[in-house]
């Protein structure tokens, strides 16, 4: 065992001072007809939790995990997996996520890498068969190794393109074997630094072909999981092709791929794109493209992807409001693509961080559900757009008018009165619901 001094993390209620207990996340509590566990579908990110060592551009790693001390790739990978499943079980999460290089280091050749992956896939499958934990999604890392300096599916080098395709093929084989509910593409190197040396048209066409081949291969092997694309505007590449939800949806529509994909949206990526997280969620939902989320938060004083654990209750409320309005998760869930801070190097910090994130989204779920149940925000919106329910507004909405009719109407109705947007009232309403939820939270486990 790697976490000998830590037991099962259980729900103890809002008054608990136990740092190894949930205060608000009660997996069995019903909210809006489903349990919290069914709504939230929490997942742990393998890379940040078990691979990361705290290294940053200015300093060496600070996190010396016992499971990463072995030298042989497979020995280390198996120890890491044992630590991971001990963590999953004690935390009580139903899912995990990984990149291929997270579960085992690359070998000296692609063939050796695949041999390692085959052995580790079998090892993980055995562990999953004796556990309640399942695979939410997996993906191929096509951004870390120097071979991807010019991209993977958008590389100017066809040999790199073929190598990346081989990695995705193996990734889909693993997804099929482990019963993944989704498969993710994140194009960290799919973009460009300067147009001076870039054939954008060719790169976008090659990228679309890459996705199409993945869809075809999945169909061939019988993998029926949901394909997801994770937008990000920049970092590590200056201009990334999957900039945000709208850009990614436009790309998929342009190349006839929209029916095969949904989006995996990350809060910190929305920040980098100049959007709120709820904006990205709303855009995806409007196009029936909301698949899953990576839960984290950024630091507005910094300009990069800090991947902090989500503790902002207000943001979690607004995110869950959009998710519930869209019908909730189907194959997706809430993956904590978040890392403990570099000075938080103790193993127990991993538990504290996930407990905080899970409690945050539990509060977000309860408040959002109550807002929707009470239709607390609906009245203001209905009043604001009331002019489109009758007269000329209804004609506009139903497409029964034209510029000439509208011009004639405007000439006869040029005394215009607008109504208040009531932003402050709405924000106060959200605050009230949030504070009430915290006030009403059961003090102890026995209270329901």
UniProtKB/Swiss-Prot annotation:
PROSITE patterns: XYLOSE_ISOMERASE. It is an enzyme of class 5 (isomerase). SUPFAM superfamilies: Xylose isomerase-like. The active site is at 99, 102. Its EC number is 5.3.1.5. Mg(2+) 2 binds at residues 266, 269, 305, 307. It comes from the Bacteria. GO terms for molecular function: magnesium ion binding; xylose isomerase activity. One of its GO terms (cellular component) is cytoplasm. InterPro entries: Xyl_isomerase-like_sf, Xyl_isomerase-like_TIM-brl, Xylose_isom_bac, Xylose_isomerase. It catalyses: alpha-D-xylose = alpha-D-xylulofuranose. GO terms for biological process: D-xylose metabolic process. It is found in: Cytoplasm. Mg(2+) 1 binds at residues 230, 266, 294, 337. Its main location: cytoplasm. The keyword Cytoplasm applies. Keywords: Carbohydrate metabolism, Cytoplasm, Isomerase, Magnesium, Metal-binding, Xylose metabolism. Binds 2 magnesium ions per subunit. Its cofactor is Mg(2+). Belongs to the xylose isomerase family. HAMAP family: Xylose_isom_A. Homotetramer. This is Xylose isomerase.
